[in-house]
C-alpha cells in the first residue's frame, strides 16, 4: 500500500503493477486508488492564501483497475496495453507543491509557478518516452493527463500546440468530479474508453493507436506511461 504520494500516484501504481504482472507469470494485480482530499479543507489563512486554490479544485474519489500480462482468450478482454512507464523529478521545482502533517491535519501549499514548471518540462518527458517508437506528433496521441487544474491544462495545451479535443476527457472529469488526486487518471481512462465506444470508434483510445498517460504531483514529480489501445 502507498500513502501520501499525491497527484502523480495514479501513474506510479500503474507502473508498479505493470512490473509485478510482467515478472510473475499468470499474475493479476488489483490497483485501487482511493482519495479523501476533503481532509485538507481548512479556513482561509493570511499566510497561505495559495491553499484556497487546492481547496477549490479538489474532490474525493476512488477507482480500480486490474493489470495483467498474457490475457486469457475468451475470458479476459484488455482495454489498454501499458507499453512503458517512467518517473522523473522536474528540475528547479523543489517546494513547488508541499504537503505537511500538522496538528490541524494534512495541509498543502502550491506555488503560483507550478503550471509553468510543468508545461516547460513536459515536452522533454514526451520525447524521452515516445522517441523509441518514433512518435513526435503529440496530436497523433490520445491523452490521459492528470488535470491538476485549468491553468496547468491551458499551459500544457498551448506549449504542445494540442488540439482542444485532446484534453477534452481530462477537462470533463475535472468539471464533473474535481481533482481527485491519484484516482483522476483512472477516471479519465474510463472516460476515453466510454466515449470511444459510444462513437463507434475502431479502438479504445479515441480511434487512435498510441496514447500517453501523465501524472503530476509533489516533487515536482512526473509519471509518464505510454499506452497502446486495443480494438474496440
Curated annotation (Swiss-Prot):
Q: Where is the active site?
A: 7
Which keywords does UniProt give here? Acyltransferase, Flavonoid biosynthesis, Transferase
Superkingdom as given in the UniProt entry: Eukaryota
What Gene3D superfamilies does UniProt report for this protein, alphabetically?
3.40.47.10
SUPFAM superfamilies reported in the protein's UniProt record: Thiolase-like (SSF53901)
Instruction: Tell me the InterPro entries matching this sequence.
Output: Chalcone/stilbene_synt_C (IPR012328), Chalcone/stilbene_synt_N (IPR001099), Polyketide_synthase_type-III (IPR011141), Thiolase-like (IPR016039)
EC number(s) recorded for this UniProt protein: 2.3.1.74
Which parts of the chain are coiled coil? none
One Pfam family this chain carries?
Answer: Chal_sti_synt_N
Transmembrane ranges, per UniProt, are none
An example of a GO molecular function for this protein is: naringenin-chalcone synthase activity
Q: Pathway, according to UniProt?
A: Secondary metabolite biosynthesis; flavonoid biosynthesis
Keyword Transferase in record: yes
Q: Catalytic activity annotated for this protein?
A: (E)-4-coumaroyl-CoA + 3 malonyl-CoA + 3 H(+) = 2',4,4',6'-tetrahydroxychalcone + 3 CO2 + 4 CoA
Q: Which GO terms of type biological process are on file? A: flavonoid biosynthetic process; polyketide biosynthetic process
Function recorded in the entry: The primary product of this enzyme is 4,2',4',6'-tetrahydroxychalcone (also termed naringenin-chalcone or chalcone) which can under specific conditions spontaneously isomerize into naringenin.
Tell me which family the UniProt entry assigns to this protein: Belongs to the thiolase-like superfamily. Chalcone/stilbene synthases family.
Name under which the protein is recorded? Chalcone synthase
Q: What is the lineage of its organism?
A: Eukaryota, Viridiplantae, Streptophyta, Embryophyta, Tracheophyta
Gene that produces this protein: CHS
Amino acid at each position: 500500500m502507498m500513502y501520501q504520494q499525491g497527484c502523480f500516484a495514479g501513474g506510479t501504481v500503474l507502473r508498479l503493477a505493470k512490473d509485478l504482472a510482467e515478472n510473475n507469470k499468470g499474475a493479476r494485480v488489483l490497483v485501487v486508488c482511493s482519495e479523501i482530499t476533503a481532509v485538507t479543507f481548512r479556513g482561509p489563512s493570511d499566510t497561505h492564501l495559495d491553499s484556497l486554490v487546492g481547496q477549490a479544485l479538489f474532490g474525493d474519489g476512488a477507482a480500480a483497475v486490474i493489470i495483467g500480462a498474457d490475457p486469457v482468450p475468451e475470458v479476459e478482454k484488455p482495454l489498454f496495453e501499458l507499453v512503458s512507464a517512467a518517473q522523473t523529478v522536474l528540475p528547479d521545482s523543489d517546494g513547488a507543491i508541499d504537503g505537511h502533517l500538522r496538528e490541524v491535519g494534512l495541509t498543502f501549499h502550491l506555488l503560483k509557478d507550478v503550471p509553468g514548471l510543468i508545461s516547460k518540462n513536459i515536452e522533454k518527458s514526451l520525447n524521452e518516452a515516445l522517441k523509441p517508437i518514433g512518435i513526435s506528433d503529440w496530436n497523433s496521441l490520445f491523452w490521459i493527463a492528470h488535470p491538476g487544474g485549468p491553468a496547468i491544462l491551458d499551459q500544457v495545451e498551448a506549449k504542445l500546440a494540442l488540439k482542444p479535443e485532446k484534453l477534452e476527457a481530462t477537462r470533463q472529469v475535472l468539471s464533473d468530479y474535481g481533482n481527485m488526486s491519484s484516482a483522476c487518471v483512472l477516471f479519465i481512462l474510463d472516460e476515453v474508453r466510454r466515449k470511444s465506444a459510444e462513437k463507434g470508434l475502431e479502438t479504445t483510445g479515441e480511434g487512435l493507436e498510441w496514447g500517453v498517460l501523465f501524472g503530476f504531483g509533489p516533487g515536482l514529480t512526473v509519471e509518464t506511461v505510454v499506452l497502446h489501445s486495443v480494438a474496440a
